[in-house]
């Protein structure tokens, strides 16, 4: 349960600071910020569903939404797309294979979450949700700059 709260906290931070970070962003930078905010909202929704144990059947659809965005992540970071609004570290472009591997990890883990959700087994869903949030955090730790305040 502690890890579920940590995942929800991470999602809340992502959503809470998104409005400030998006101010002035345009083009691909705004698009990727919007997509990351979308993932944050979906992760938060999954966490809420797990806490209430209602809507567990909907988690598969939520996980598939995360998976679809995760599959597009590398294309949202083309060369030369770092500007003053971007929260991306230069490592995104300097360590591209590692960045793409982190994206693939989120695709894989969110796919496993969808499968776990279809099983209806709450413990399996919760365990796999933790793996999804770990994939998110792993990428953010390596490739996302700290929140601007």
Q: What are these language model-derived features?
A:
Residues 132-143:
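The canonical Cys-X-X-Cys-His
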Residues 144-148:
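Short, charged, intrinsically disordered terminal tails
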Residues 23-131, 149:
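Extracytoplasmic c-type cytochrome modules immediately beyond a signal peptide or single-pass transmembrane anchor
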Residues 16-18:
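N-terminal signal peptide c-region/cleavage motif recognized by signal peptidases
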